[in-house]
């Protein structure tokens, strides 16, 4: 078995970025509460994320699955995963327009199989953060957001070649993640529904194959939020 890097490594620059964002959020909310125009949301999402879809012009360099199909036959599953997502949003309203910051943590895991019996398991943890802009309508709050972040991923391969089998575990972190999203919140007093479509570029090099796999793609998510 070949191993690369620790499981879900935490880099110093990641800690600094998240800490700096949290400091900004704390200062931002502290100042705005004095004029009663600061809002915070805690959201829980689920839905579908298509790893094979082009992330809306952000760029994707995925050739890992195609390379495996050349040697191990057709992929038996599609490349859609079902992420679990938790989001935190802090923003300040000025009339019907609002802007602020957001932090999102998502995780997914899926096994893929090929026609010759080979297979792999892909697991990823994403931490995304950026800016959000809202229009506060009477019945819904459409929004647009963009930002950056990182993904940590683990891939476990079991690949057959004739009578031999190769098992490999690869760990990797992608620090060049970028995203943007469109969506809407439908409020019902302090809680409500949220729908969003997100486009994410996060290309990871698989060291065992010298190929790239997309960890982002296009997500269509639905969830609930609580405002406070």
Where are these regions (language model features)?
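Membrane-embedded beta-strand positions of outer-membrane beta-barrel proteins
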Residues: 40-46, 101-105, 142-146, 182, ...
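Extracellular loop and loop/strand-boundary signature of outer-membrane beta-barrel proteins
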Residues: 70-77, 113-122, 162-171, 205-213
């Amino acid at each position: 078995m070949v191993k690369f890097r620790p499981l879900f490594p935490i880099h110093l620059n990641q800690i600094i970025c998240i800490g700096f964002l949290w400091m900004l959020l704390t200062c931002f909310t502290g100042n705005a509460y004095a004029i009663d125009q600061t809002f915070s949301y805690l959201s829980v999402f689920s839905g579908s994320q298509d790893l094979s879809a082009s992330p809306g012009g952000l760029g994707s360099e995925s050739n890992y699955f195609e390379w495996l199909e050349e040697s191990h036959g057709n992929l038996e599953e599609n490349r859609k995963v079902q992420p679990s997502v938790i989001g935190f949003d802090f923003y300040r309203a000025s009339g019907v327009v609002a802007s602020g910051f957001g932090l999102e943590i998502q995780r997914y895991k899926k096994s893929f199989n090929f026609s010759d019996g080979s297979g792999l398991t892909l697991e990823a943890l994403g931490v995304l953060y950026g800016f959000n802009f809202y229009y506060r309508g009477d019945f819904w709050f459409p929004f647009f957001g963009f930002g950056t972040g990182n993904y940590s991923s683990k891939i476990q391969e079991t690949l057959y070649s004739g009578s031999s089998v190769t098992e490999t575990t690869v760990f990797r972190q992608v620090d060049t993640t970028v995203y943007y999203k469109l969506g809407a919140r439908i409020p019902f007093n302090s809680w409500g529904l949220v729908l969003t479509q997100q486009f994410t570029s996060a290309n990871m090099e698989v060291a065992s194959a010298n190929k790239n796999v997309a960890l982002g793609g296009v997500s269509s998510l639905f969830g609930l939020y609580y405002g406070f």
